[in-house]
C-alpha cells in the first residue's frame, strides 16, 4: 500500500498548505520517487464548478474534465503527475456516494452513520487515488477545529492507527505570528492548534511553522517541547520573495529526509536534484527583459479567480528571462471609456468568464488591441469577445452577440453547444434547460491546427490537446462569412464541428490569437506553454519597437 503524508492546517486558513505540500512533493519527485497528490475539501458542494469565483477562486480543470479546487493547479505545476477526478474529493461527493449506495441497498439495511460509513467512503477514495505510487500527499482543506473537517480528520486518524507511522505521516501547517509591538514571534497559537489536533487523536510528526520571518532555533525548541514533536521536525517556513525558493528551503532543513526515513523510502529515493527550481529562482531574480500585460477580466478583485492565468504568464516570461508585470483591469470599468488604461501595456490578455456583466468591456478591449496593433491573447470568453468584435466592427453584423448574453440577437455568432463528441467518443447533448453543474464541454480535447497559421507555428505540430470548460461556442453558420472578411480559423475540433482557435493574419496584426480552450491549465514553470511563451515574446517585440527577438531560455 502507498505510504501517505497527510497535510492539515491550523490557526487560520490561507497559510499555503497547498504550496507547502506541493513543494514537498516536488522535492520527493526530485529524489526519483513517483509522487501523487490529493485534496479533501470539507465543503458540501459536490465540486467547485458552480461556486462563485469571488468566494472560491479559480475552478481548475483536469484532463478527465473534473472541476476541482485551485490547489490541484499548484500540485500539477510542482509535480509531473497529471491528476484526475479521483484527486479532488469533497464532503458533497462523499455524501452523494454514500447516499447512492444506501439507495441501492449496499448497506443491507444498516443505519447509515458518519462512523463507519462516511469515514469508510473517505478512506476508499484515498486508496483509489493513491494506489500505485511510491508516496502520496493528501491535503485536508480548512483548519483544525472546523466542524466540517471532523469526518476527514477521523478518517485519517483511522488510517494511521491501522497502517502505523511507517505508512502514514502527519504534517501540520500552523501560524507563528509576529507581533510588531512586542517585537517577537508568538508560539501560543501553534501550541493550541496542536492541542486541538491531539484532542481528536492525531499527533503531528512534522510541524511547518508559517511566519513573516524565519523562526529562530529557540522558538523551534519551545514549540517542540510543548507539542511533543521532534525539534528537527519543527520546520520554519517564512514568507519568500519567489515561490520557487520553497522546495530548496524545505530541503535545506531536512524535511524530505525526515519523510524518507519515517516512511522507509530510502531504498527508492536517490539524491535530490533541485537544479530546475534553482534555475527558476535565478531567472526570476535576474531577468533580462520586462513587460507589462493587462489582464482584463470579470473577477479581478479576487485574483485567485485567475490563478493559473497569472502563473502561466509568469512561466512564459520565465522561459525568456523576462519579468512579467500584471495590470489587472475590471472589464466593466472599461465600458464607456477611451481605453486609456490600456495605453501603456505591452500585451493584452482577456481570460474566461460567464455572464453578461463586463462582456462589452471585453469586446471593446479586443477592438482596441486589434486596431492599435497590441498583442492580444483571448482565452475562452476572450475568444468569444474577439469573435463578437470582429463580427460587429469588421464584418458589419449589427447586434452580433453571444446567446449567453442576448438570446434575441439578430446575429448570434456565439451560441450554446447542443452536441459534441468527447475524448472517449461519447456524444454529449445539452440545452438551455440543463443543470449548470457538470454540463459543460470539459476536459482534454484534441484539435487540428491549420498549416501556416500562428497557432501551428507556436505549437510546432498539427494536432494538439488542451483542456476545456465552456458551454458556448463559435456559431458555424457564420464561419464562412467571418473567414471571407479576413478572420483566420486556425484550429478546429477533430470532427471539424467546433472552432477552437481564431487569429488575424500576420500581415494585418503582429500577434492576435484567441482560443476556446484553457491553455493556462497545462503551463508549468518547467516548460511554460507555447501560446504563453509566444505571447510574451510578442509583448517584448512590441516594447522593442517591433524588433524580432529570439527566445532567451532560462
UniProtKB/Swiss-Prot annotation:
Enzyme class, broadest EC rank: ligase
Glutamine amidotransferase type-1 domain ranges (all copies): 292-545
Designated name of the protein: CTP synthase
Family, per entry: Belongs to the CTP synthase family.
Organism: Stenotrophomonas maltophilia (strain K279a)
Pfam family of the protein (one): CTP_synth_N
Protein residues bound to CTP: 13, 146-148, 186-191, 222
GO molecular function terms listed in the Swiss-Prot or TrEMBL record: ATP binding; CTP synthase activity; glutaminase activity; identical protein binding; metal ion binding
Amino acid at each position: 500500500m502507498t505510504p501517505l503524508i497527510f497535510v492539515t492546517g491550523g490557526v487560520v486558513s490561507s497559510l499555503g498548505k497547498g504550496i507547502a505540500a506541493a513543494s514537498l512533493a516536488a522535492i520527493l519527485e526530485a529524489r526519483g520517487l513517483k509522487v501523487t497528490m490529493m485534496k479533501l475539501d470539507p465543503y458540501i458542494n459536490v465540486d467547485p464548478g458552480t461556486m462563485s469565483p469571488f468566494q472560491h477562486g479559480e475552478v481548475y480543470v483536469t484532463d478527465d474534465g473534473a472541476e476541482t479546487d485551485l490547489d490541484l493547479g499548484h500540485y500539477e505545476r510542482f509535480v509531473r503527475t497529471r491528476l484526475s477526478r479521483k484527486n479532488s474529493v469533497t464532503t458533497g461527493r462523499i455524501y452523494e456516494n454514500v447516499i447512492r449506495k444506501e439507495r441501492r441497498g449496499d448497506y443491507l439495511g444498516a443505519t447509515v452513520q458518519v462512523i463507519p460509513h462516511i469515514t469508510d467512503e473517505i478512506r476508499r477514495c484515498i486508496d483509489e487515488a493513491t494506489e500505485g505510487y511510491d508516496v502520496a500527499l493528501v491535503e485536508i482543506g480548512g483548519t483544525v477545529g472546523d466542524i466540517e473537517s471532523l469526518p476527514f480528520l477521523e478518517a485519517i486518524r483511522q488510517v494511521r492507527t491501522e497502517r502505523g507511522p511507517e505508512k502514514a505521516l502527519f504534517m501540520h501547517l500552523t501560524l507563528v505570528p509576529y507581533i510588531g509591538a512586542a517585537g517577537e514571534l508568538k508560539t501560543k497559537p501553534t501550541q493550541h492548534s496542536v492541542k486541538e489536533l491531539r484532542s481528536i487523536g492525531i499527533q503531528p510528526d512534522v510541524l511547518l511553522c508559517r511566519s513573516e520571518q524565519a523562526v529562530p532555533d529557540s522558538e523551534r525548541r519551545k514549540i517542540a517541547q510543548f507539542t511533543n514533536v521532534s525539534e528537527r521536525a519543527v520546520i520554519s517556513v517564512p514568507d519568500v520573495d519567489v515561490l520557487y525558493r520553497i522546495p530548496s528551503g524545505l530541503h535545506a532543513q531536512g524535511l524530505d529526509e525526515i519523510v524518507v526515513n519515517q516512511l522507509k523510502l530510502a531504498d527508492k529515493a536517490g539524491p535530490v536534484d533541485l537544479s530546475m527550481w534553482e534555475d527558476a529562482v535565478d531567472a526570476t531574480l535576474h531577468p533580462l527583459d520586462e513587460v507589462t500585460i493587462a489582464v482584463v477580466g470579470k473577477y479581478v478583485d479576487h485574483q485567485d479567480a485567475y490563478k493559473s492565468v497569472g502563473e502561466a504568464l509568469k512561466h512564459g516570461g520565465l522561459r525568456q528571462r523576462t519579468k512579467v508585470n500584471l495590470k489587472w483591469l475590471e472589464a466593466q470599468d472599461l465600458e464607456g471609456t477611451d481605453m486609456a488604461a490600456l495605453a501603456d501595456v505591452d500585451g493584452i490578455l482577456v481570460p474566461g468568464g460567464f455572464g453578461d456583466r463586463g462582456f462589452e468591456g471585453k469586446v471593446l478591449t479586443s477592438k482596441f488591441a486589434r486596431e492599435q496593433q497590441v498583442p492580444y491573447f483571448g482565452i475562452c470568453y476572450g475568444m468569444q469577445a474577439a469573435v463578437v468584435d470582429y463580427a460587429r466592427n469588421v464584418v458589419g453584423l449589427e447586434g452580433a452577440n453571444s446567446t449567453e448574453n442576448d438570446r434575441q440577437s439578430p446575429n448570434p455568432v456565439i451560441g450554446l453547444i447542443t452536441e459534441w463528441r468527447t475524448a472517449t467518443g461519447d456524444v454529449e447533448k445539452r440545452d438551455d434547460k440543463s443543470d449548470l453543474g457538470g454540463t459543460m464541454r470539459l476536459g482534454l480535447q484534441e484539435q487540428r491546427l491549420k498549416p501556416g497559421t500562428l497557432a501551428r507555428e507556436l505549437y510546432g505540430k498539427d494536432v494538439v490537446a488542451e483542456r476545456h470548460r465552456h458551454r458556448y461556442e463559435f456559431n458555424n453558420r457564420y464561419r464562412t462569412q467571418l473567414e471571407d472578411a479576413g478572420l483566420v480559423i486556425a484550429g478546429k475540433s477533430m470532427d471539424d464541428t467546433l472552432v477552437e482557435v481564431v487569429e488575424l493574419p500576420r500581415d494585418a496584426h503582429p500577434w492576435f490569437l484567441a482560443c476556446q480552450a484553457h491553455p493556462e491549465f497545462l503551463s508549468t514553470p518547467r516548460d511554460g506553454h507555447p501560446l504563453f511563451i509566444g505571447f510574451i515574446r510578442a509583448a517584448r517585440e512590441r516594447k522593442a519597437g517591433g524588433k524580432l527577438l529570439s527566445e532567451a531560455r532560462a
